[in-house]
């Protein structure tokens, strides 16, 4: 039996009193894997294994003069950096590997397989058509077709033991027209997308209200990257995401902790924050994991979920996030189950899928 067909003995409600303090790291990871995880914030275009990435670099002779370690340092972001802006510039280099549609399909398939192996039962992947097409001027319609085929093939091979939703990303870093085209692309393919997002450099999106209204009016809910970048002078990105764009969820949102007014606004609107702890640490948006605001946000009554963001860039997987939160902020299994139930309830996938998973695992 391969790991792709291995049955995971997911934790039940009456197993949450396991004494984690008696377990070593390897044993804890076995427990983390058994948590029925619902992940809402993971960039598909940056979700790959190191082995796969290096294989692509070598196959297409992208950096012939660099050793494997130097390739990692040039492209990826496994060590703490300076800022979100530095990360974005580094991630642009990764578009070197999006040479053809076969690679894109392999990324999609392997991402699903890897999430399943990590114990994820529901994953919402997000991707930017313009980001993938950027380097080699690929056709975004073919990119999308390839991604959907790759996901569907993987889910089928896994006998539908993992459920996948797809979110379209629009970016404002190039031009307003680029964002508008992404919105139109999302609406045109709304049978495949469960949501729409903004990513890239964090900014106040109030000037783009018309574009986001267009997406929402076509029945597509919004999740917006906001409250991530510690270098911004104010919290306007979060206020605009909630009050102007009417986002249902916020990507990151860790700076909500800076404002009692925002905490109350988030709770009033029942908005979930898609928290990505290791990402926040590596992008220098928190000083250390033990000072990460997720614990204070959780204790304040805000709904939060645990996510990997860009696991290919960070060389991480979802269970690393749980390990860090346990070691540094004393989260326990009951906390983790509650966060995953929130993530399931706030997912954009069809209600019948959510009802089925809730009955099975929660």
Curated annotation (Swiss-Prot):
The UniProt catalytic activity note for this protein reads: adenosine + H2O + H(+) = inosine + NH4(+)
Give the record's GO CC terms: cytosol; external side of plasma membrane
Annotated region Gating helix loop: where? 169-183
Annotated binding of Zn(2+), by residue: 41, 43, 225, 309
What EC number(s) does the entry state?
3.5.4.4
Q: State a single Gene Ontology molecular function.
A: adenosine deaminase activity
Q: Which cofactor does it need?
A: Zn(2+)
The UniProt similarity line reads:
Belongs to the metallo-dependent hydrolases superfamily. Adenosine and AMP deaminases family.
Can you say what this protein is called?
A: Adenosine deaminase
């Amino acid at each position: 039996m391969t790991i792709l067909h291995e049955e995971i003995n997911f934790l039940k409600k009456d197993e949450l009193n396991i004494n984690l303090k008696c377990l070593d790291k390897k044993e804890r990871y076995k427990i983390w894997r058994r948590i029925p995880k619902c992940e809402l914030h993971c960039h598909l275009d940056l979700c790959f294994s190191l082995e796969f990435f290096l294989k692509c670099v070598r196959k297409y002779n992208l950096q012939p003069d660099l050793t494997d370690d130097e390739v990692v340092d040039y492209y990826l972001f496994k060590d703490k950096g300076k800022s979100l802006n530095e990360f974005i510039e580094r991630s642009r280099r990764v578009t070197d590997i999006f040479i053809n549609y076969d690679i894109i399909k392999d990324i999609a398939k392997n991402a699903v397989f890897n999430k399943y192996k990590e114990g994820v039962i529901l994953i919402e992947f997000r991707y930017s058509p313009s980001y993938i097409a950027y380097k080699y001027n690929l056709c975004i319609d073919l990119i999308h077709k390839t991604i959907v085929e790759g996901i569907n093939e993987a889910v089928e091979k896994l006998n539908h033991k993992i459920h996948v939703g797809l979110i379209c990303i629009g970016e404002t870093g190039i031009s307003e027209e680029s964002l508008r085209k992404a919105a139109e692309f999302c609406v045109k393919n709304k049978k495949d997308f469960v949501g729409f997002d903004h990513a890239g450099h964090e900014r106040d999106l109030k000037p783009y209200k018309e574009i986001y209204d267009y997406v929402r009016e076509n029945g597509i809910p919004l999740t917006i990257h906001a409250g991530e970048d510690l270098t911004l002078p104010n919290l306007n990105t979060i206020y605009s995401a909630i009050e102007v764009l009417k986002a249902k969820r916020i990507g990151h949102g860790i700076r909500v902790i800076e404002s009692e007014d925002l905490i109350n606004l988030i709770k009033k609107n029942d908005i979930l924050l898609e928290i990505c702890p290791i990402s926040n640490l590596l992008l220098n948006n928190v000083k250390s994991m033990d000072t990460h605001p997720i614990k204070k946000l959780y204790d304040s009554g805000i709904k939060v979920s645990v996510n990997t963001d860009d696991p290919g860039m960070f060389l991480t997987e979802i269970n690393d996030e749980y390990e860090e939160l346990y070691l540094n902020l004393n989260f326990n299994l009951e906390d983790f189950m509650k966060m995953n139930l929130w993530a399931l309830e706030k997912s954009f996938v069809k209600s019948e899928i959510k009802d089925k998973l809730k009955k099975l695992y929660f």
